[in-house]
Amino acid sequence: MRWVAKAAVQRGLGVLPQGERLNYVFQRHVLRSLPASESVFRRKFSRAQQHLRAYEEHGPGTPPSASVFYEFGAGWDLAIPLSYAALGVGRQVLVDIRPSVRAELVNDSLAAFARLRDELESEAGRELRRLGGPVGSADELEERFGITYLAPRDARATGLPSESIDFVSSTDTCEHIPAGDLAEIFAECFRLLRPEGGFSCRIDLQDHYSYFDPSLSRYNFLRYSDRAWRLVNSPLHHQNRLRSPDYLRLVREAGFELVAEVPSGPSLEGLAELEGLPLAPRFRVYPPEELGVTILSFVARRP
């Protein structure tokens, strides 16, 4: 039941005025999940490359160096936006519901780029832009990397000009946003994109507490009714439990044209896990092959 203890701590922090800051301290000094390990950093760089390939294949045709990328929920260490900068993206706009960027974690990312430069260039098959040394604060992001960081800023209503963005990307963020808010965020992304602009998204549909507590099934959270889940679901680590058809429906309802969807899972082991779980009624209506998707990647385009 380790996950229950973690959920209780994060739910408690979520109601405190300085909950985000305290959660950062909890993640860094108690769980020691921050800063990201080199293996996690490498994965983030690879995901930035995947998004960039989606832009080059399905985007409006503007070279990355002359384009404007947009991301909601940019997080603490900016590993993916910095990867874009290293890969040659000209301008980026990032929004967070609360100020989340931590200069010390951004500097960990910058140090990783310097340390792993040869390896990353080999993986990318191109020379990377040199990002330089540490930053003193988020105020330096725009001048040094072309990154405009806006926080606090509501991703449902950013106030940014319509049709001002070439490409939207999101990595392991959508699963943490309530469904109603996500529908509004997708609609806002549609408004921001220029015609033929692209939207590349990766979503982790697994119970994230299973990463912390190996005794849990990756589908554990599907056992609980909405009422029961609300008791443990923290605003600092919200999990909406949407399944792959739900996300794809929201994308279409926002007006996007889906051009690629790549679900991962369920494996045979995953199907066996699902069969052994007492599913909440809400989840019994999904076919197992849809309910058990663990990772959903999709690319959409504004017509």
State what each model feature region is.
Residues 249-252, 258-303:
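A C-terminal cap/extension of S-adenosyl-L-methionine-dependent methyltransferases
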Residues 110-154:
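S-adenosyl-L-methionine
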Residues 230-245:
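Acceptor-substrate binding/catalytic loop of class I
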Residues 183-198:
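A short glycine-rich, Lys/Arg-flanked "PGG" loop and its adjoining helix->strand segment in the class I
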Residues 170-173:
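A short beta-strand submotif of the Rossmann-like class I SAM-dependent methyltransferase core
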Residues 64-76, 198-225:
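Conserved class I S-adenosyl-L-methionine
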Residues 155-168:
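A short acidic, Gly/Pro-enriched loop at the edge of an enzyme's catalytic core
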